Amino acid sequence: MDPLHIGHVRLIKAAQKLGDELIIILNNDNWLKDKKGFVFMPQRERKEMLESICGVDRVVFTDHQPGEYFKDRSVCRLLKKIRPHIFANGGDRKPDGDPVPEVALCEKLGIEIIYNVGEGGKVQSSSWLLAKVAQANRKS
């Protein structure tokens, strides 16, 4: 969720309908720096924006440390701590052949995983948006 976009809003609105409380697990700046090499929007700003969406009860950061992305990019530690009834995933996640650690943990803890939450699958991407900005900057 860096930057936030309409796909995230649709995911959140759909996820609200799945339960009584909506907790968003937000990848922290360390995770983003390891994955992309930079942070576009600082975690505090992303958190504040998410908290301003009606129906979001809580936003929690992952506790990834610098360099940890390549060892553990999952949100398993927080799933163990929060113990939600449902783990909702957006339009870019697949139920088939997706050997992510969250699947095994959710099965073990009895957490239901719901895929493709939101309208219309993957309608936007943070990476796509950043690529458009980079392309526009190259042209100017």
Where in this protein do the model-derived segments appear?
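Nucleotidyltransferase catalytic core that binds NTPs
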Residues: 1-140
